[in-house]
Swiss-Prot record:
It comes from the Bacteria. Residues 1-19, 26-54 have a biased composition (Basic and acidic residues). Residues 1-54 are annotated as: Disordered. This is Uncharacterized protein YczO.
């Protein structure tokens, strides 16, 4: 049996390389703000169930 050398294909669309791309700081901040806002809204309501039905 002869060994075939495996050819590495170049990545056709590098934009989809999400794992290696660092998330931009602005996006991170926005996500954190969203989470905080959601938590605050939930805290301000009488109960979580109350918040879910709104």
């Amino acid at each position: 049996m002869t060994e075939k050398k495996q050819q590495n294909k170049p990545n056709e669309n590098p934009e989809h390389n999400d794992l290696t791309d660092p998330i931009p700081n602005e996006e991170l901040k926005e996500n954190m703000n969203d989470e905080k806002h959601k938590r605050q809204q939930r805290d301000n309501s009488q109960s979580e169930r109350d918040y879910d039905t709104k």
